[in-house]
């Protein structure tokens, strides 16, 4: 059976992109994205839920994000899910976090 790992998100940046470079000179940008979902509860009241997602962009996409995006700006991200794991320096415990590795980014002209 074939596998598929694809994510498509439209949301607003929660902070300015943080750009850095690897020792080999590859650009990496870290973004925070807030994605809103509106639904009705059992009483018919409208409820807005926000999901906060960390996104990593690489190479030219990272540089473009740093150049054109800022906190509050709407953006479309296509990418894949990736599990990051590390050892907590304070407790020594293993930690993990699901994030999105962006493979395509489009600036949105409308504010979400």
Regions found by a protein language model. Give the residues of each.
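Core FKBP-type peptidyl-prolyl cis-trans isomerase
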Residues: 3, 9-49, 94-96
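Residue-level recognition of specific faces of alpha-helices
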Residues: 3-6, 30-32, 54, 85, ...
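Intrinsic-disorder/low-complexity, polar/charged segments enriched in Ser/Thr/Lys/Arg/Asp/Glu/Gln
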Residues: 6-8, 52, 72
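OB-fold and OB-like beta-barrel modules that bind single-stranded nucleic acids
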Residues: 11-13, 33, 71-83, 102-105
């Amino acid at each position: 059976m074939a596998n598929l790992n694809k994510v498509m998100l439209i949301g607003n940046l929660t902070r300015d992109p943080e750009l850095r470079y690897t020792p080999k000179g590859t650009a990496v940008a870290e973004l925070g994205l807030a994605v809103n979902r509106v639904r009705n509860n059992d009483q018919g009241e409208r409820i807005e839920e926000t999901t906060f997602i960390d996104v990593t962009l690489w190479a030219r996409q990272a540089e473009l994000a740093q150049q054109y995006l800022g906190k509050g700006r709407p953006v479309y991200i296509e990418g894949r899910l990736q599990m990051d794991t590390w050892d907590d320096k304070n407790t020594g415990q293993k930690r993990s976090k699901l994030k999105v590795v962006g493979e395509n980014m489009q600036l949105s002209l409308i504010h979400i």
